[in-house]
Amino acid sequence: MQRNGVVECSVCRSRLVVPSPRSVSRAYDKHRSKISSKFRALNVLLVVGDCILVGLQPILVFMSKVDGKFQFSPISVNFLTEVTKVVFAIVMLIIQSRKQKVGEKPLLARSTFIQAARNNALLAVPALLYAINNYLKFIMQLYFNPSTVKMLSNLKVLVIAVLLKFIMKRRFSVIQWEALALLLIGISINQLRTVPAGNTAFGLPVTAIAYIYTLIFVTVPSLASVYNEYALKSQYDTSIYLQNLFLYGYGAIFNFLGILGTALFQGPESFNILRGHSRATMFLICNNAAQGILSSFFFKYADTILKKYSSTVATIFTGLASAAFLGHTLTINFLLGISVVFISMHQFFSPLAKAKDDKPAELLELEDTQNHRSSESSFVNMTAGAAEDASHRIGTDERQPLLPT
């Protein structure tokens, strides 16, 4: 049980402070170096699945347009996507609860649900940011072709790296920062002369509107991803399906509020969430739901950087598929940009590029623990379990509660 930043052992009632963002990041790095072959296979499956789903998404959006416009409300697609993910989370929770062992706290118990809801209340923040980002995905399709949208989304990697450094205290080596710079260069090469000049929208040049949407399109989901990763890993003991239920539930609420707002401005007829939908939009909803579910596994069991680099690989699939099925031309800029992107990926994930701490990981963990205990000494001394805290032996499972087994 967690109270006031302190975790209480359910067996001996001793207390330990909650790990800091830096210790969460270091725990993941330590685990990654000792990762099993089975978990590596899981990562490969996650990356492959993410490449396929992310690559298909802009193509399905393009196929959903009629005469270059959407006949349906993008907010309705986002709402139906969140509802689909909520249903999936409920089904998986029921399946997981039936496989629980005797003596384990039931997942579907009211007390478990209420406590988990309190501990994961911060998931409402990334849910709101995701709701905004999902709407922007459709807006971006009005200004760029599918492969260009994917290349623009890769800008999130640099923003995410900066956010990880300041929010989760992740360390990146100079080589890794250079790899991110190469990624930006590759994207810039692909973006040369992609926006036609002379067109206007909302009274402003298309380029200006596109740049504004691009800035929001890159910043909002990056902040949501990092915040989501921290929220999921900080409550690692909570079932991922229960956490997803809260995240998707918040998302459904925010998108439904968006539908209500649209109905107030455009009239009651716009409240029909199924108006203008086709078979392509149904595939789009399923694809978006699968992306969201897969992303939660990335954030909890891997990290956001791996998720975004796997999305970068999807750029090739998107470019080739859009050329084959939609008639788009693969320019030399696109091919050169993709080459630089892959060089960046190889450099970033190279073993020689990994950042190393000046001190051993065990010593740094000991220092973090001592600093936390010093700051919380007054609280610990006031509790009846202070003596037990000094004698309680911490096992491997308790020392690293944020890592998958």
UniProtKB/Swiss-Prot annotation:
Single GO molecular function: transmembrane transporter activity
Keyword Transport belongs to the record: yes
Family annotation (SUPFAM superfamilies): Multidrug resistance efflux transporter EmrE
Transmembrane segments: 44-64, 75-95, 122-142, 148-168, 172-192, 201-221, 245-265, 282-302, 323-343
Superkingdom: Eukaryota
UniProt feature, compositional bias: Basic and acidic residues: 389-405
Keywords of the record: Golgi apparatus, Membrane, Sugar transport, Transmembrane, Transmembrane helix, Transport
Stated role: Sugar transporter involved in the transport of CMP-sialic acid from the cytoplasm into the Golgi. May transport important nucleotide sugars such as CMP-Kdo (2-keto-3-deoxy-D-manno-octulosonic acid) in physiological conditions.
Name of the molecule in the record: CMP-sialic acid transporter 5
Organism whose genome encodes this protein: Oryza sativa subsp. japonica
Lineage: Eukaryota, Viridiplantae, Streptophyta, Embryophyta, Tracheophyta
